């Protein structure tokens, strides 16, 4: 018997559309929470595939980095040119608890600061906070005209630039190495370090637009859940009852 195709068999209809499944039905929304050092805690939402088999949704979320405008976190448009990076470290329920991961300026702000007839001074230094976070801070400053100055330009001499840069690194080292990451974040928001540099360098050459333009996280310590929960205003300690001390009494069996 010859083996081959049987043309008389009914063929399946070609061109039938396959049933398309919406990929969003397999995903869940999670709320991103900013640390308590910022005024606005609800940053936004993120999508992740649901937990299936060995793939855990929490593992997919941990380590995610989100970039948020500081103006949104502080509810102040004056901070619109600064961007904050937050890293997801822990997932509790539908909330992603984040920690500070870095800070940067928008490119349009940096370009607007650079002008003619003035000197640009930059400095960067690697510091370690008291809670063992290794950070690299980048500072930027510009010279300005002295009072009653007639000369058009405000160029600083090479020796003055070196002296200013040395002062900048000293102040950044002092301010950053004597506090925790949370305390440093609190200093960066109102630009305390920039004002300190401006005051300290008045005797060398007057400065303007002094900013910590970038903060880069190089190394983080071992993850501590308790520290993260404290950062978010929560606690991981369980409420325990008070221990009651009672005298030991030996049971005496009655004779039958």
From Swiss-Prot:
Keywords, comma-separated and alphabetical: Acetylation, Cytoplasm, Ribonucleoprotein, Ribosomal protein
Superkingdom, natural source: Eukaryota
Compartments, as annotated in UniProt: Cytoplasm
Coiled-coil intervals, chain numbering: none
Residues with the N-acetylalanine modification: 2
GO terms (BP aspect): translation
KW Acetylation (keyword) present: yes
Record-linked InterPro entries: Ribosomal_eS1, Ribosomal_eS1_CS, Ribosomal_eS1_euk
One of the record's GO molecular function terms: structural constituent of ribosome
Family membership: Belongs to the eukaryotic ribosomal protein eS1 family.
Subunit structure: Component of the small ribosomal subunit. Mature ribosomes consist of a small (40S) and a large (60S) subunit. The 40S subunit contains about 33 different proteins and 1 molecule of RNA (18S). The 60S subunit contains about 49 different proteins and 3 molecules of RNA (25S, 5.8S and 5S).
Protein name listed in UniProt: Small ribosomal subunit protein eS1
């Amino acid at each position: 018997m010859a083996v081959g195709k049987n043309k008389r068999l009914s063929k399946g209809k070609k061109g039938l559309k396959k049933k398309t499944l919406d990929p969003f039905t397999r995903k869940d929304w999670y709320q991103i929470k900013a640390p308590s050092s910022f005024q606005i805690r609800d940053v936004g939402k993120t999508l992740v595939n649901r937990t299936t088999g060995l793939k855990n949704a929490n593992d997919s979320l941990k380590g995610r980095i989100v970039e948020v405008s500081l103006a949104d976190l502080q509810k102040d448009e004056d901070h619109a040119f600064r961007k904050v990076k937050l890293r997801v470290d822990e997932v509790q329920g539908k909330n992603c608890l984040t920690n500070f991961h870095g800070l940067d300026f928008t490119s349009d702000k940096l370009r607007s600061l650079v002008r003619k007839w003035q000197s640009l001074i930059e400095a960067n230094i690697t510091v370690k906070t008291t809670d063992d976070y290794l950070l690299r801070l980048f500072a930027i400053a510009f010279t300005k005209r002295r009072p009653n100055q007639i000369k058009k330009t405000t160029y600083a001499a090479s020796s003055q630039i070196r002296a200013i840069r040395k002062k900048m690194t000293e102040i950044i080292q002092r301010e950053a190495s004597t506090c925790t990451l949370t305390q440093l974040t609190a200093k960066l928001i109102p630009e305390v370090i920039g004002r300190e540099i401006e005051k300290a360098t008045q005797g060398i050459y007057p400065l303007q637009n002094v900013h910590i333009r970038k903060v880069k996280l190089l190394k983080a310590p071992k993850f501590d859940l308790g520290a993260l929960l404290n950062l978010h205003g929560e606690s991981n300690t369980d409420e325990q009852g008070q221990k009651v001390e009672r005298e030991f009494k030996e049971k005496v069996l009655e004779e039958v």
